[in-house]
Amino acid sequence: MERWWFNSILFKKEFEHRCGLSKSTGSLGPIENTSESEDPNINDMKKNIHSWGGRDNSNYSNVDHLFGVKDIRNFISDETFLVRDSNGNSYSIYFDIENHIFEIDNGHSFQSELESSFYSYQNSSYRNNGSNSDDPHYDHYMYDTQYSWNNNINSCIDNYLQSQIFIETDIVSGSDNYSNSYIYSSICGEIAGSGIRTRTDGSDLTIRESSNDLDVTQKYRHLWVQCENCYGLNYKKSFKSKMNLCEQCGYHLKMSSSDRIELLIDPGTWDPMDEDMVSLDPIEFHSEEEPYKDRVDSYQRKTGLTEAVQTGIGQLNSIPVAIGVMDFQFMGGSMGSVVGEKITRLIEYATKKFLPLIIVCASGGARMQEGSLSLMQMAKISSALYDYQSNKKLFYVPILTSPTTGGVTASFGMLGDIIIAEPNAYIAFAGKRVIEQTLNKTVPEGSQAAEYLFQKGLFDLIVPRNPLKSVLSELFQLHAFFPLNQN
């Protein structure tokens, strides 16, 4: 367990104008004043705050960082904090982010200090306009300071979990009422038994790793999705609503087939096909690690899918379409006999019903556990597409996502009337590792990225996820596929 010392105050927005702060409350920079701290642990920091609540001899000093969204990440564990008020009295605060617990032990006089400060401010503020209790939030802070502390901490936690780690603190609150409160603090942490000391320095908070950092990271890793490009963390709960785009660099991360269907197909119009079709073990593939059937079963439990592709009929901006979406999370999106059969049946249905066709590709290629049966799916799908495109003159759009490799690239992935790729998608026939091991040559960086291949003419469009649905809708209407409800 870690022990932390910090001087703290509960600070409302309106105090900024009365106390003459040199910087706004939305800033993470230091706040200057002339008073000196009496705490030997933080005396050298020399970042102070002006008198608070009209008291020139205020001992609230060395107030440096906003304890809000940016700094909550340093306290993601159950820890006890020792808090010193302006009178030099110390109090124990228990902080449990997981269970939303914030308790002050022996905190009566500490809360009284807060109430006194708020009372002083309230009198000076309301005396000028002749009102004492017009503000409904005044009573909230006056008579239930413990509640306001809990509210503030819970708000900090919730806002942090809905943002990336290095988000600017000025977007934490946008309301104009008085309920927004901040805790400004100067933190000097001391890990029990180790002698490692941490402190704030300027506008950057430096925290050295403690012995339980790894455990804390593992404990909360299920809350985050790490970007493959910038390694930033994205809150998983809101990640889906952001189309799996990194909030920090905009990188397109992998999406599940269900999320893609939800992105492209109008709500309530999705009608799946061949959901009960599952893989057997046609060649009785032998594996010392895990039998093929057991591996398929494990992926079915993990993903909730029966195979690496979902096919069905739906509406895209009210335009009826046939769509197949591959899922890389199911055995790397590998194309086996079931995947090939489901896509072939989808194409045949679209041919019969004269529907436009979309196939979202995300695959590592043919499934080796099914041998030549998986390879023949390339020819089978291509044959069905020939009838769909050449004989029926219908419109097919493949969408190449990361990664699209192997047999999918060599067959239906590159047979579209208009081929669309996502930004930064990895598209290749043979992967980088296979090429380098086979030819003993280094593959140039970025030579298998969508932007480079677009310059070489391998596909027609690079479309981000945000406008993808509207782009497809315009393409379909250009090819005489119109919405059902159009007059």
Curated annotation (Swiss-Prot):
One GO CC term, this protein: chloroplast stroma
Quaternary context: Acetyl-CoA carboxylase is a heterohexamer composed of biotin carboxyl carrier protein, biotin carboxylase and 2 subunits each of ACCase subunit alpha and ACCase plastid-coded subunit beta (accD).
Zinc finger intervals, C4-type: 227-249
Organism: Panax ginseng (Korean ginseng)
Gene of this entry: accD
Biological process according to GO: fatty acid biosynthetic process; malonyl-CoA biosynthetic process
One Gene Ontology term of the molecular function aspect: ATP binding
Localization of this protein: Plastid, Chloroplast stroma
Annotated protein name in UniProt: Acetyl-coenzyme A carboxylase carboxyl transferase subunit beta, chloroplastic
Domain CoA carboxyltransferase N-terminal per the UniProt entry, residue ranges: 223-487
Entry annotated with the keyword Zinc-finger: yes
Entry binding sites for Zn(2+): C227, C230, C246, C249
